[in-house]
From Swiss-Prot:
Residues 537-547 have a biased composition (Gly residues). SUPFAM superfamilies: GroEL apical domain-like (SSF52029), GroEL equatorial domain-like (SSF48592), GroEL-intermediate domain like (SSF54849). Keywords: ATP-binding, Chaperone, Cytoplasm, Isomerase, Nucleotide-binding. This is Chaperonin GroEL. Belongs to the chaperonin (HSP60) family. Together with its co-chaperonin GroES, plays an essential role in assisting protein folding. The GroEL-GroES system forms a nano-cage that allows encapsulation of the non-native substrate proteins and provides a physical environment optimized to promote and accelerate protein folding.
Length: 547
């Protein structure tokens, strides 16, 4: 067992805060319309250029274990904000640093950390309620485009393309982002489907940064029953390996030995594979699998028709241009199904909707109809160089996530203004003691920091701008850092999704509370010895596969 380094009290927290400062200083430069890019060295290929806070945060690991513990805690605030709302990662980082630093000063001065936390929680809950009250639902294409533009660092084309994609497939529709093979940026609607089942093992992930499995031009095997043994599948698996194409398995379940064997072969590179459970339950599951079969020009392997896995040929497998699988969802893009067969299936479902008398059945049939006929909008991002394409693709993905958040919970005045004005009612909150009051004051001060940072990144004095805005009673009155003017932020189209602002604050407060209430820190002692490389097992069997 590795020896441990143990630190206590203010010394431990101070070192953690040093790590927090290092990460926050790297991330904060990206905030606002005049935020700067960060260049990140990659282990292979050209460096990555990004203005995405969470990408910067994820790239940072510090040599000092205690400082690194602080940096990793701060990173978790940015990561959580990205997972829940898709944006607001830099705001979460700036807020968390401010809350943690001020909180630690008061703990060092003798304040009770638990009461400080209670005061902070009271204040955060009050601000969340203010954000909900201030939020305004968005309906028009223009408002959707505004959110996309702001979240992509003022790129109007990105905002307009996202609005167009949402118009094509609906606000709840499936929209994916991929790299184009030319200079253009286009929206293309293709045959596709999304269902709410994710990968059965995280070992199927191919993109560890986004924690998704991406399969290009895969075969798709649809099996009605559970898979617990791969022996009957060996002929078809061998054929897939020889084709050098990936395989997606959709079955009632894949368990035990079958799942373990697929994972081993995926890790050893013998078989590019992912497995997901089939969507739905009972008869509806079978119907949805038949929908997928028609969409991908495959066959549902079902014992009702006397079909057996050992007799399945590669001709029975469906195909698609691309499949993306996250922890919760699977998206099939551009299935190779016959257009006429898909149209016939749509008509069949429509007739079932007309005939059914059950509201529940009707709702489920309409869901199937939407999945089969809605299609998938693909945002194809082009550019002059690989670095430019990747940087722009990151911004498109951020903007798309922020736009979805805006559709879900509405929008508020952007540019840090909503958080700044939400701090004013906090002075009226009732508390039990002075320590809780100090916790509220920590939040009041921290809520100024995102706006200050936006202004300072634009080259102005943040403190002066904050003071001027607090004198103004209009909650939408703010500072347009792009044009360096004081404006009504809503009328100027400078808006943020309410969900993004709310999530950033809640995640920041959660991390800061952990830091100020930490009294002891235990980390592995640094070792200069190189770890020996593990021996790799043989890759016997068919074509590098191990069954």
């Amino acid at each position: 067992m590795a020896t441990k380094l143990i630190k206590h009290g203010s010394k431990a927290r101070e070192q953690m805060l040093e790590g927090i400062d290092i990460l926050a200083d790297a991330v904060k430069v990206t905030l606002g319309p005049k935020g700067r890019n960060v260049l990140i060295e990659q282990s292979f290929g050209s460096p990555k250029i990004t203005k995405d806070g969470v990408t910067v945060a994820k790239s940072i690991a510090l040599k000092d274990k205690i400082r690194n513990a602080g940096a990793q805690l701060l990173k978790s605030a940015a990561t959580k904000a990205a997972e829940v709302a898709g944006d607001g990662t830099t705001t979460a980082t700036v807020l968390a640093r401010a809350l943690a630093r001020e909180g630690n000063k008061l703990v060092a001065a003798g304040y009770n950390p638990m009461d400080l936390k209670r005061g902070m929680d009271l204040a955060v809950n009050a601000v969340v309620e203010e954000i909900k009250k201030s939020s305004k639902k968005i309906n028009s294409q223009e408002e959707i485009a505004q959110v996309g533009t702001i979240s992509s660092n003022g790129d109007k084309e990105i905002g307009e393309k996202i609005a167009k994609a949402m118009e094509e497939v609906g606000k709840e529709g499936v929209i994916t982002v991929e790299e184009a093979k030319n200079f253009s940026f286009d929206v293309e609607v293709v045959k596709g489907m999304m269902f709410d089942r994710g990968y059965l093992s995280p070992y199927f992930v191919t993109n560890s940064e986004k924690m998704v499995a991406e399969l290009e031009n895969p075969f798709i095997l649809l099996f009605e029953k559970k898979l617990s043994n791969l022996q009957p599948m060996l002929p078809i698996l061998e054929a897939v390996v020889q084709s050098q194409r990936p395989l997606l398995i959709i079955a009632e379940d894949v368990e035990g030995e079958a799942l373990a064997t697929l994972v081993v072969n995926r890790l050893r590179g013998g078989l590019k594979v992912a497995a997901v459970k089939a969507p739905g339950f009972g008869d509806r599951r079978k119907a949805m699998m038949e929908d997928i079969a028609i969409l991908t020009k495959g066959e549902l392997i079902t014992e009702d028709l006397g079909m057996k896995l050992e007799n399945v040929s590669i001709k029975s497998l469906g195909t698609a241009k691309r499949v993306t699988i996250s922890k919760e969802n699977t998206v099939i893009v551009d299935g190779n199904g016959d257009k006429k067969n898909i149209e016939d299936r749509v008509l069949q479902i429509k007739s079932q909707i007309a005939e059914t008398t059950s509201d529940y059945d009707k709702e489920k049939l309409q869901e199937r109809l939407a999945k089969l006929s809605g299609g998938v909008a693909v945002l194809k991002v082009g550019g002059a160089t690989e670095v430019e394409v990747k940087e722009r693709k990151d911004r498109v993905e951020d903007a798309l996530a922020a736009t979805r958040a805006a559709v879900e919970e509405g929008v508020v005045a952007g540019g840090g203004v909503t958080l700044l004005h939400a701090s004013q009612p906090l002075t009226k909150l009732k508390v039990e003691n002075k320590d809780q009051q100090a916790g509220i004051e920590i939040v009041i001060e921290a809520l100024k920091d995102p706006l200050k940072q936006i202004v300072e990144n634009a080259g102005e004095n943040g403190g002066v701008v904050v003071g001027k805005l607090l004198e103004h009673k209009d909650k939408n009155y703010g500072f347009n850092a792009q044009d360096m003017q004081y404006v009504d932020m809503i009328k100027a189209g400078i808006i943020d999704p309410a969900k993004v602002v709310r999530t950033a604050l809640q995640d920041a407060a959660s991390v800061a509370s952990l830091i100020i209430t930490t009294e002891t820190l235990i980390v592995d002692e640094s070792s200069d010895k190189e770890e020996p490389m593990p021996m790799r097992g043989g890759m016997g069997g068919m074509g590098g596969m191990d069954f």
